[in-house]
Amino acid sequence: XTLSEPEPTCSIEYFRYQAIEDCEYSISVK
């Protein structure tokens, strides 16, 4: 990915761009 296109799933790379809380939120929504 890239910063312009964050992955829909929570991944290590995603943590670099978004806070862990946001990552967990994405999982809950999905």
Curated annotation (Swiss-Prot):
Query: What superkingdom does the record give?
Result: Eukaryota
What enzyme class is recorded for this protein?
A: hydrolase
List locations, semicolon-separated. Secreted
Q: Where are the transmembrane segments?
A: none
The answer to whether UniProt assigns keyword Protease to this entry is: yes
Q: What is its EC number?
A: 3.4.-.-
Q: What is this protein called?
A: Hementerin
- Record organism: Haementeria depressa (Leech)
